[in-house]
């Protein structure tokens, strides 16, 4: 997606959202897609409210911080009819065992996206993962 023109990126993103509407395994589909995005070496301060970027501006990027990927997960789900009424949160979390910062997307308090580039249920998340800040995503439509 990085080498595409902006208009083509919008089409790819729209096609993903359309496929999420009917796919029997939507969380596998979205995590596979997100795992193909290039991760930037840039750092963003996810604790700063101004670090949240609107969806269309995210698409302008050629690479993404881990926080931007979490935002893209959230926006993608919110802009589908299937998940538009779901509660979407970004959890800025820390694996206290590995001293690693994580940006996880929680859907309806039960599904976690982005942990090890997979979808998992909240009860299967290791107990060493501790949320440090929760960003509740406002509905988009």
Located regions from the model:
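A structural boundary/capping signal
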Residues: 1-141
């Amino acid at each position: 997606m990085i080498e595409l023109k902006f208009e083509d990126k919008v089409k790819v993103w729209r096609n993903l959202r359309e496929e999420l509407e009917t796919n029997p395994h939507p969380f596998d589909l979205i995590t596979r897609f997100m795992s193909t995005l290039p991760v930037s070496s840039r750092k963003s301060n996810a604790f700063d409210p101004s670090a949240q970027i609107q969806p269309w501006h995210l698409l302008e990027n050629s690479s993404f911080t881990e926080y931007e990927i979490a935002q893209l997960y959230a926006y993608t789900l919110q802009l589908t009819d299937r998940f538009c009424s779901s509660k979407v949160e970004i959890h800025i979390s820390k694996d206290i065992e590995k001293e690693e910062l994580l940006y996880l997307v929680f859907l309806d308090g039960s599904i976690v996206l982005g942990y090890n580039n997979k979808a998992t249920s909240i009860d299967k998340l290791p107990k060493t993962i501790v949320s440090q800040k929760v960003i509740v995503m406002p509905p988009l439509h």
